[in-house]
Amino acid sequence: MSSRCLSLLLCATACFGAGGRVLRVCADPNNMPFSNRAQQGFENQLANLIAKDLGMTVQYYWFPQRSSFFRKTLNAGHCDIVMGLPSGMDDAATSVPYYRSSYVFVSRRDRRLNIKSMDDPRLHHLRIGVHTIGDGDGSLPPVNALISRGIVHNLVGFNIYGRLDEKNPPADLIRAVENNKVDIAIAWGPMAGYFAKHSSVPLQVTPVDVVSPDPKIPFTFAISMGVRRGDSQLLQRLNSEIQQHRPRIHRLLESYGVPLLAAPPSAAAIAIPERSQLLRNCCKRGTDL
C-alpha cells in the first residue's frame, strides 16, 4: 500500500469511524433537482436522511460533475459517498438501487402530441431538442437512437454542461419546449420531471417506450449510491438504509417529479453495456443518470 493510499485510508477512518460523526458527500453545487449548494436537491435530502439515521452530520465537497468528477472527488479521498450513480458503474462500489428511471419525451400539453415511441413517424419532421456533450465523450442514448433511425437534420442540441455561472444548465432544454423553440424534447426523466412540474406552461412528460434494435442503447437506468471500492462497511450500511427507507425514498422522489419505474425482474436486467459513461453524461455525472 502506497503512502498516498494509506493517508486516504486514515482520513476515511477518522471521518467515518468511531471517532468521527461526519458523512462526507461529494456533489455538484448547481445540478437541480439532484443537488445544489443550498442543499435543495433530492440527493441532498437523502444524504440528510441517512446521516441523521446514522447519528452523523453531512459535510459536502462541492465539485462540478464533469467527466473527471469521480477521479477528483470520491477516488481522491475528498468524500466517502456520492448519492446518485448507475448501479454497477466502474468508478465506485455501488449500493443496491434506490430508484429506477428512464428518458422521457417532454412536450407542451396544448400541442397534444402524445408521442411515446422513438419509432413515431412524426419525429422525422418535428424539431427535437436533445442534450449534447463535448467531443470525445460519445453521445447520449436519445441522440444515438435518433441517428440510427435517420433522424438528424431536425435535431436541436443543448449542451448539458452549460456555463459554470449559469443556473441549472440542463433546464435550458425544458425551457426551449416551454418557449416553442422546439416541438418536443427527449431528456433524462428525473431532471425533466422536476422542471416540468415547476413549469409555468403545462407540459406532458412521457417515458420513452423503446424497442431498440441495438441493445447497447439503454433508456432506463437503476440508480445507486457509490463509495470507494473496498469500503464494505459503509456500503453495507447504505444497503441497510435503502432497504429500510425505500417507501420514504420513493415518496421523496415523487415529490420532486421523478418518473419511477418498477424494479427489473433480476439483477441481470440492469447490467447494461456502457451505461456508466452514458449515465455519467446524461445526469452530469456523470446521469450520470
Language model: regions and residue ranges:
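Bacterial N-terminal signal peptides that target proteins for export
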Residues: 1-6
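Extended ligand-binding regions for polar small-molecule ligands
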Residues: 41-53, 109-113, 119-137, 213-260
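Hydrophobic residues within well-ordered alpha-helices
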Residues: 50, 73-75, 121, 176-178, ...
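A conserved helix-loop-strand patch within extracytoplasmic ligand-binding domains
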Residues: 56, 87-90, 97-150
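A ligand-binding cleft/hinge motif common to bilobed small-molecule-binding domains
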Residues: 68-69, 75, 83-93, 178-217
